[in-house]
Amino acid sequence: MACGATLKRTLDFDPLLSPASPKRRRCAPLSAPTSAAASPLSAAAATAASFSAAAASPQKYLRMEPSPFGDVSSRLTTEQILYNIKQEYKRMQKRRHLETSFQQTDPCCTSDAQPHAFLLSGPASPGTSSAASSPLKKEQPLFTLRQVGMICERLLKEREEKVREEYEEILNTKLAEQYDAFVKFTHDQIMRRYGEQPASYVS
């Protein structure tokens, strides 16, 4: 019987030593109403904390968020700009060559255009005719290729800065709209859940 008593005691005391003891289960209903009463307050506190966090200015988010233009380098290098200018100059020369060859192969158009030019400008002297044809042969460029490349590069940089400013302005506007909508939504949720309940002064 003593052995049976000791075995029975060990079996009876095992639930007391375990984390989920029967005594705690009996005390659980007594503490349930307090936890149920505290749950709306904790939810209200959490919602108020989220509302206060949302009350920050959207400019803080903009300062934390890196700009999408930060890692983007210039799309065209100086060598690429010069290469594009050379190709465009070659295309212009081909276009002029085609125009002059078309005028030479179509004499009817030139013969029809000569009387009108004669009536408008009068008889031309030999010096003026040679001077008029000389710019096609002896055309002096106003800028060198390097200067044209520098001008194009500066224009591209100015255009890039303008696009960046427009993008930042549009982004600020959209973020401000989202911020206002989020604040209004949070305020409506708080008023819908806890607007009818009396104010609580729980510290």
UniProtKB/Swiss-Prot annotation:
Transmembrane segments: none annotated. It is found in: Nucleus; Cytoplasm; Membrane. Polyubiquitinated. Polyubiquitination is dependent of UBR5 that extends pre-ubiquitinated AKIRIN2. A motif (SYVS motif) lies at residues 200-203. The modification Phosphoserine is found at S18, S21, S57. Keywords: Adaptive immunity, Cytoplasm, Developmental protein, Immunity, Innate immunity, Membrane, Nucleus, Phosphoprotein, Protein transport, Repressor, Transcription, Transcription regulation, Transport, Ubl conjugation. One of its GO terms (cellular component) is chromatin. Widely expressed with the highest expression in peripheral blood leukocytes. GO terms for molecular function: enzyme binding; identical protein binding; protein-macromolecule adaptor activity; transcription coregulator activity. GO terms for biological process: adaptive immune response; cerebral cortex development; defense response to bacterium; embryo development ending in birth or egg hatching; innate immune response; nuclear protein quality control by the ubiquitin-proteasome system; positive regulation of adaptive immune response; positive regulation of B cell activation. A motif (Nuclear localization signal) lies at residues 22-27. Belongs to the akirin family. Molecular adapter that acts as a bridge between a variety of multiprotein complexes, and which is involved in embryonic development, immunity, myogenesis and brain development. Plays a key role in nuclear protein degradation by promoting import of proteasomes into the nucleus: directly binds to fully assembled 20S proteasomes at one end and to nuclear import receptor IPO9 at the other end, bridging them together and mediating the import of pre-assembled proteasome complexes through the nuclear pore. Homodimer. Interacts with IPO9; the interaction is direct. Associates (via SYVS motif) with 20S and 26S proteasomes. Interacts with SMARCD1; promoting SWI/SNF complex recruitment. Interacts with NFKBIZ. Interacts with YWHAB. 'Akiraka ni suru' means 'making things clear' in Japanese. The name is given based on the presence of the clear nuclear localization signal. This is Akirin-2. The lineage of its organism: Eukaryota, Metazoa, Chordata, Craniata, Vertebrata. The gene is AKIRIN2.
